[in-house]
Amino acid sequence: MKNENILVVKREKLFPETAFQGLVASGTQALLEIINREKEFKPRPLMEEDSAYKQIIPYLLFKYQDRYFLMQRKSTNTDQRLKNKYSLGIGGHMRQEDLGNGDSIFDWGKREFHEEIAYSGNLKMSTLGILNDDSNPVGHVHLGLVLLLEGDSEHIKIRSELKSGQLLTALEIQKFYADLETWSQIIFDAILNPLKTEKANQKQSSSVY
């Protein structure tokens, strides 16, 4: 693990009362304002063990038409808790130098995407929500800003730190569900779950008649 200063925010500043659990789409802008106002930069090794702080992680999903980019982490991943896991998200820690020259978290997110992924098409970015999961040691010290990158090209491949990647439909991704990292499972359940989508479509169709 690198000994670098990363962006963190005190838990009590993010959650003055009870912390929500899961992926929440509402209130994203308010939390971003808190992050910008209360952000600190502290040594990563210390923060991995300090639950008084949340490490802010932009977590980017790539989508092309009806397919999402599913990746598998290397067994040599720097965080041993995530090795060999499958992931829907591209992300990482933010350092002080990453946010220089007036750059935003979103600017950093696009740079991080292009550092890890070889992709030459156009991208449209949108915010899906904030993800919090205190049910395990990894999630307890991290907070995810979940972003969706929609591309106009299917030509995409892994550049660094991740082992493999492929574009799959939600139904195909479901086969890997047990091996998805926890954040990706939460996102799958909230957004991609084909059974949930099918029920919503059936409900919408029945309301037409």
Stretches with model-predicted labels:
Residues 115, 119:
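Acidic, glycine-rich loop-and-strand cores that form catalytic or ligand-binding grooves
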Residues 67-112:
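Conserved Nudix-box catalytic region and its N-terminal flanking loop in Nudix hydrolases
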Residues 1, 51-54, 139-141:
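A short catalytic or substrate-binding loop motif that flags glycine-/basic-rich loops and adjacent residues
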